[in-house]
Amino acid sequence: MGFKTKMQNLFLGNTDDLDELEYENDATINKGRGASQQEYDEYYEDSTPTVTQKEDPVRQSNIVPIHTKKAKSQVILSEPRVFNEAQEIGEHLRQNRAVIVNMQRMSKDQSRQMINFLSGVVFALDGTITTISQNTLLCVPNNVELAGSISNLLGEDDINHKGW
């Protein structure tokens, strides 16, 4: 026995017995006259490995489309009659919606309260509040940028309005 054979026997066990078993199985099929077609087919049917297709796991793509649809911005038109409706306007601002507030139907005291409340909400949200007309305000959250000025279109009497 050579060194290589000793190492194989140590790790794999004695392989001489396995070789003899394989030859014995082959001898039973051949029987000295050649195997019949049926014996040949039976032998190779049993020994053919079954092939199973391995499904590749579904890989999720890291590709993101360039032109994604952005969420639509909304502008809410509000015409409150009492100060109690101010909380609803504040909720719209918190949800990053611009709000136009028409206070023509409110009393002067309640419209002052509304302006004070909305000024606080807009300040807390880092937004902007702008007078559009005599009794109308535009309140926008920080995700909306205002450009331009309306005061140039108003007369001096409208700018110095003492209604509030």
Swiss-Prot record:
It is found in: Cytoplasm. Residues 29-57 are annotated as: Disordered. One of its GO terms (biological process) is division septum assembly. One of its GO terms (cellular component) is cytoplasm. InterPro entries: Cell_div_SepF, Cell_div_SepF/SepF-rel, SepF-like_sf. Gene3D superfamilies: SepF-like protein. Keywords: Cell cycle, Cell division, Cytoplasm, Septation. Its main location: cytoplasm. Cell division protein that is part of the divisome complex and is recruited early to the Z-ring. Probably stimulates Z-ring formation, perhaps through the cross-linking of FtsZ protofilaments. Its function overlaps with FtsA. Homodimer. Interacts with FtsZ. HAMAP family: SepF. Belongs to the SepF family. This is Cell division protein SepF. It comes from Exiguobacterium sibiricum (strain DSM 17290 / CCUG 55495 / CIP 109462 / JCM 13490 / 255-15).
